[in-house]
Swiss-Prot record:
NCBIfam families: PRK09194.1, proS_fam_II. Its main location: cytoplasm. It comes from the Bacteria. InterPro entries: aa-tRNA-synt_IIb, aa-tRNA-synth_II, aa-tRNA-synth_II/BPL/LPL, Anticodon-bd, Anticodon-bd_dom_sf, Pro-tRNA-ligase_IIa, Pro-tRNA-synth_IIa_bac-type, Pro-tRNA-Synthase_IIa_type1. It is found in: Cytoplasm. This is Proline--tRNA ligase. It comes from Halorhodospira halophila (strain DSM 244 / SL1) (Ectothiorhodospira halophila (strain DSM 244 / SL1)). One of its GO terms (molecular function) is proline-tRNA ligase activity. Catalyzes the attachment of proline to tRNA(Pro) in a two-step reaction: proline is first activated by ATP to form Pro-AMP and then transferred to the acceptor end of tRNA(Pro). As ProRS can inadvertently accommodate and process non-cognate amino acids such as alanine and cysteine, to avoid such errors it has two additional distinct editing activities against alanine. One activity is designated as 'pretransfer' editing and involves the tRNA(Pro)-independent hydrolysis of activated Ala-AMP.
């Protein structure tokens, strides 16, 4: 492809509204252009990358035995009402009405549609298992679209759905999909980790996220390098202390702490480490009362864990200060469990292991020190309520945890019968009896993979594409193209490279060398070959890898073979 026929829409300035590197570089490289909030047009350069990711996904899904279909983007409300998700899904579901006043929605996902297709088409256990997939545009009405295509309202997704007679067969297919996903992300050239994850709004019992590792990642993941354990911090269990709780050494005392509001302030004022301070968080209870969640001062509440506790109202709702002061007669900033009546107390395992700790005294400007369980207040109900921290024991008992940042690009679920029961998806088994099928679903954010690849692979000059998904394999640059000898040599090399099946972008513009080099580095083509008057005299060309420090001179007669060896 010639640049004169493939206009580059590169810019030198970083757009002011682009917050993360991938958004900045996709705009600067001319890969995408914003149409409206969360809506983007993919330009030819960006589309080439998107299509390469899509091709890898399609090849591996086909290899794993999945069958490609294409379902409508607009879905009737009746299916969502039948599954029970019409009201549950929330405002991210863009609801519409047609001219006949029929309700529908733009699909953010397709569990209902595929389950409806299955119950119409598949009748016998002999037709199982079956796994359908599609690569299609989705729409989720994000309240604050940001980060370019990383969190857009419209995006390209591969979603697959499998149907099985029993859970054993589902688990086998789930493992096949897990392996297929690993091959997909290996082929894209990305560093990634599969991690245990929460099932969220999709539902089901077991799920894994596939995380591209990047410092800018929105998600925190807990990893044990010794054992290979990995989980989203939302799900990672915090191991309870195993050693005996220390015996009390101090007497309880009430201490004035004027103006000290935060854990850090109180700890510094009292001369105690934050780990020996107890924080009390009041939330709405499932029975309409209040629940006090008690954590060590240096630990953070894991809201997902708290929300799953049967005593806690879902979704998790923190108590309003007005209600606390009215019902308990004490200010928000001085709460503590001692003498707190009419409130259910639930302590994190680590908090229940404290001795001689400090906590709020339930009156303004005062805290208690030397507090001990069993002496100053009853032994609490305990639960895992906190987020894991670096250095915690790994839940699998091998080694310790480190925390990494990741970008979710894939998510797979064992759905079970969540949708098939609600929608009556069944088959006749070997005995001729109706049997509800069990399901799995498997998603990849295809457009999100592109942004994640940039977040992981860039420098101060631009994108450094992994070779399998680069828009072009080789950039051919002619220096002093107005020189007939240079033009002739560059044209001949372009023809040779193209004939050899190499995907090449030939910069035949009448532009300064610095402009050409800067553009090729910005758009991230992995290999650059330069034809210049000096190189012609030497019978060579100049080669430079995108991340090489210095160029290499390669004989002209050998460059095609030399490149092909590096591309395989």
């Amino acid at each position: 492809m010639r640049v004169t026929r493939f206009p580059l829409s590169t810019t030198r300035e970083t757009p002011a509204d682009a917050e993360i590197v991938s958004h900045q570089l996709m705009l600067r490289a001319g890969m995408i252009r914003r149409l409206s909030s969360g809506l983007y047009t993919w330009l030819p350069l960006g589309l080439r990358v998107l299509q390469k990711v899509e091709r890898i996904v399609r090849e591996e899904m086909n290899r794993a035995g999945a069958l490609e279909v294409l379902m409508p983007a607009v879905q009737p409300a009746e299916l969502w009402q039948e599954s029970g998700r019409w009201e549950k899904y929330g405002p991210e579901l863009l609801r519409i009405r047609d001219r006949h006043d029929r309700e529908g929605c733009f699909g953010p996902t397709h569990e209902e549609v595929i389950t409806d297709l299955f119950r119409r088409e598949i009748r016998s256990y002999r037709q199982l298992p079956v796994n359908y997939y599609q690569i299609q545009t989705k729409f989720r009405d994000e309240i604050r679209p940001r980060f370019g295509v990383m969190r857009a309202r419209e995006f390209l997704m591969k979603d697959a759905y499998s149907f099985h007679l029993d859970d054993d067969d589902l688990r086998a297919e789930y493992q096949r999909m897990h392996e297929a996903y690993c091959r997909i992300f290996q082929r894209t050239g990305l560093a990634f980790r599969p991690v245990e994850a929460d099932t969220g709004a999709i539902g089901g019992s077991v799920s894994h996220e596939f995380m591209v590792l990047a410092d800018s990642g929105e998600d925190a993941i807990a990893v044990c390098e010794a054992s290979g354990y990995a989980a989203n911090v939302e799900l990672a269990p915090a191991v309870a202390p195993t050693e005996p709780r220390p015996a009390p050494q101090a007497e309880r005392a009430e201490v004035a702490t004027p103006g000290q509001r935060t854990i850090a302030e109180v700890a510094a004022y009292l001369g105690l480490p934050e780990a020996r301070n107890l924080k009390t968080l009041l939330v709405e209870g499932a029975d309409g009362g209040l629940v006090a969640l008690l954590l060590r001062g240096d630990h953070e509440l894991n809201e997902l864990k708290a929300e799953k506790h049967p005593a806690v109202k879902a979704p998790l709702t923190f108590a309003e200060a007005e209600r606390v002061e009215r019902q308990l007669g004490c200010p928000f900033g001085s709460l503590g469990p001692v003498g707190l009546t009419g409130v259910t107390l639930i302590a994190d395992h680590a908090a229940a292991h404290l001795a001689d700790f400090a906590c709020g005294a339930n009156r303004e400007g005062y805290h208690l020190t030397g507090v001990n369980w069993g002496r100053d207040l009853p032994e609490p109900e305990t639960a895992d309520l906190r987020e894991v921290t670096a250095g915690d024991p790994s839940p699998d008992g091998e080694g310790t945890l480190t925390l990494r940042r990741g970008i979710e690009v894939g998510h797979i679920f064992q759905l079970g019968t969540t949708y098939s029961e609600a929608m009556g998806a069944s088959v006749l088994d070997e005995q001729g009896q109706e049997r509800t099928v069990t399901m799995g679903c498997y998603g990849i954010g295809v457009s999100r993979v592109v942004a994640a690849a940039i977040e992981q692979n860039h420098d101060d000059r631009g994108i450094c594409w992994p070779a399998p998904i680069a828009p072009f394999q080789v950039a051919l640059v002619a220096i002093k193209a107005e020189d007939p000898a240079v033009a002739e040599a560059a044209e001949a090399l372009y023809a040779d490279l193209t004939a050899s099946g190499i995907d090449v972008l030939y910069d035949d513009r009448d532009a300064r060398p610095g402009v050409k080099f800067a553009d090729m580095e910005l758009i991230g083509i992995p290999h650059r070959v330069v034809v210049s008057p000096r190189a012609i005299q030497e019978g060579s060309v100049e080669y430079k890898g995108r991340q090489d420090a210095d160029p290499t001179h390669v004989p002209r007669a050998e460059i095609v073979t030399w490149l092909k060896n590096r591309l395989t």
